[in-house]
Curated annotation (Swiss-Prot):
GO-annotated molecular function: structural constituent of ribosome
Native organism taxonomy: Archaea, Thermoproteota, Thermoprotei, Desulfurococcales, Desulfurococcaceae
UniProt keyword terms in alphabetical order: Ribonucleoprotein, Ribosomal protein
Keyword Acyltransferase: no
Chain spans, region Disordered: 75-111
Listed name of the protein: Large ribosomal subunit protein P1
Pfam families for the chain: Ribosomal_60s (PF00428)
Protein's UniProt keywords contain Ribosomal protein: yes
Protein function: Forms part of the ribosomal stalk, playing a central role in the interaction of the ribosome with GTP-bound translation factors.
Gene3D superfamilies: 1.10.10.1410
One GO location term (cellular component): ribonucleoprotein complex
GO biological process, one term: translational elongation
InterPro entries on file: P1/P2_N_sf (IPR038716), Ribosomal_P1/P2 (IPR027534), Ribosomal_P1_arc (IPR022295)
Description of how the protein assembles with itself and partners: Part of the 50S ribosomal subunit. Homodimer, it forms part of the ribosomal stalk which helps the ribosome interact with GTP-bound translation factors. Forms a heptameric uL10/P0(P1)2(P1)2(P1)2 complex, where uL10/P0 forms an elongated spine to which the P1 dimers bind in a sequential fashion.
Native source species: Aeropyrum pernix (strain ATCC 700893 / DSM 11879 / JCM 9820 / NBRC 100138 / K1)
Length: 111
């Protein structure tokens, strides 16, 4: 059922991008054209809801939102790089300590 509701929204967006008017008749024809079972109550609710919405503004905001989130991500990257470098240094120090320990043992056994 939820998928059907999304299908009506997708139809409305397709009509919008095609430059058509989003009204009950156009949505009904589009739904029939793709073989959907028409639910006139859902179509009426969607059209009523969209009358209160400026689709152009909503779509501009939706496109801009991921860009803003992506711009914030690089700021976190240096901290992650520093942490990775610290971990790498710690691992190298541990390896050196192990090598020292092993070299002592190898000296004892003539290796």
């Amino acid at each position: 059922m939820a998928q059907e509701g999304k299908a009506y929204i997708h139809l409305a967006l397709a009509i919008y991008y095609a430059g058509g008017k989003i009204d009950e008749e156009t949505l009904k024809k589009a739904a029939e054209a793709i073989g959907m079972q028409v639910d006139e109550a859902k179509i009426k609710m969607l059209v009523a809801s969209l009358e209160e919405v400026n689709l152009e503004e909503v779509l501009k905001q939706a496109v801009a939102a991921p860009v803003a989130a992506a711009a914030a991500a690089p700021a976190a990257a240096p901290a992650a790089e520093e942490k990775a470098e610290e971990e790498k240094k710690e691992e190298e120090e541990e390896k050196k300590e192990e090598e020292v320990d092993l070299s002592g043992l190898s000296g004892m056994f003539g290796f």
